[in-house]
């Protein structure tokens, strides 16, 4: 199926492979992990908090469906869902967002998935710029976005906390897929509470 994007068309659904991951549309087998991703307090700490009970019930009961720009991150070796990634136009601009379950953070999966998805976007979409928004206190995410070539466009307040709106050109080169973006200066991954 071909879908119309803000600036053109792209085939959908699409599966994107990286060395360790498959970025794919969600399926019914992902429901439990998706609910956990939406309700886990560690995962949601910088994402506006865990969803409420009514939203959780709606997710449990609704068909997952295939929506343009929304994928799950699954391990290539066994298809275990470890997180999600989106590239959509909810704010009127192409926006990247990602979340991992706590036990999968700090292992390079966020960087790997972002590089793979941004590489796909540069080939398939006509957009020139992609944005990302991160809480200023989410130092790991801000550090990753900077390493991916994002720069701060502006600060803003959202969900009662300070955020950064970052942007990068889709036409600029991406870091090598094999390169590790993790450095000793990076904050440690979150721990289970």
Positions of PLM-derived features:
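GNAT-family acyltransferases
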Residues: 1-103, 115-120, 124-135, 148-193
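Glycine-rich acyl-CoA binding loop
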Residues: 109-111
